């Protein structure tokens, strides 16, 4: 509902089937293993209400809250793999469980021509996983779920061919049985320079704070790390 040129009140509801094929499993957890083809995940509902505003040229605000319910949601947990020689090796197993969460978030974006842009987002989630059979699967399903996520990102174009960026990513995990995984705190910086049309060199430095955290169970993130390369656009 547009009650002025700069204010929008909205409501939305969506859902659908998420096929757990190889590509989605690799995106979810590149180290995870499955014993059989997982069932599709169904987003049974994802409903939200929100408020958007653009009080100044180039500035956008978005406040929202909602509820999401997922059937056969993916999660990973440590397990042991038994070999033919009855030897056990640690592994990361991908499982499924029904989860739901209530969320609330805010977003602010600002851009000045093609010279400078800034964005900041934050989302809080309160997760639940009903566990009727008293197994540990319900607890495992929530261990790496994000309780709060925050992103800050700045892009600067000092000249048209050069892009510099600086950002910060924070993820705090859901508390399960009185404990929670260390939060992700990734301060990063990067750049991209197009020296010929369609040909660019890029570089990025991650974990500038040299923090100890994990995106996947049992796989600690490296300290300060660097990537770079050449990209081609055809």
What is the predicted function of each stretch?
Residues 2-234:
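Exposed, low-structure sequence patches enriched in small/polar residues
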